[in-house]
């Protein structure tokens, strides 16, 4: 999946004496900037790096876009994180993970089936 958007997006790396977090964003049209991937190096998770990177995106793009959007699985780990970052649920794409991956995807013991989109005004 990553190869579908990596070359059309912009990658950002948060470097704090070494890489801590990265993300890729794409212009989805109609004023929507989408976070396609955000990941924090495991030893540095839950230390505010991903939230700081999201805030950097908000500041950088608030005059160019009207909405920052992210799609994720309905996981007890990711949904609350994005909600704490100011995102609200927008819509879902049924069966996204089962239709686009040749193997089951699990996060925190939850089998991911639908893609949940969350949005934050910029």
Question: Model-derived features: where do they sit?
Answer:
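Short acidic/polar active-site loop segments enriched in Thr and Asp
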Residues: 31, 66, 88
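Conserved GNAT acetyl-CoA-binding A-motif
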Residues: 60-74
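Conserved acetyl-CoA pyrophosphate-binding loop and the N-cap/start of the following alpha-helix
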Residues: 44, 48-56
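Conserved catalytic-core motifs of GNAT/GCN5-like acyltransferases
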Residues: 69-71, 83, 88-111
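Acetyl-CoA-dependent GNAT
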Residues: 1-42, 54
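Short hydrophobic/aromatic beta-strand or adjacent loop that forms the aromatic wall/cage
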Residues: 9-11, 112-117
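Short beta-strand-to-coil "C-cap" segments at the C-terminal boundary of structured domains/repeats
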Residues: 119-122
């Amino acid at each position: 999946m990553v190869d579908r958007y990596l070359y059309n997006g912009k990658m950002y790396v948060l470097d704090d004496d070494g890489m801590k977090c990265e993300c890729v964003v794409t212009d989805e049209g109609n004023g929507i900037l989408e976070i396609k991937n955000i990941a924090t190096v495991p030893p540095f998770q839950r230390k505010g790096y991903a939230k700081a990177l999201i805030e950097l995106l908000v500041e950088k793009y608030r005059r160019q876009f009207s909405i920052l959007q992210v799609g994720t699985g309905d996981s007890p780990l990711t949904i609350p994180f994005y909600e704490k970052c100011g995102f609200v649920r927008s819509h879902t794409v049924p069966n996204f993970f089962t239709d686009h991956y040749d193997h089951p995807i699990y996060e925190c013991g939850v089998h991911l089936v639908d893609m949940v989109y969350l949005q934050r005004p910029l």
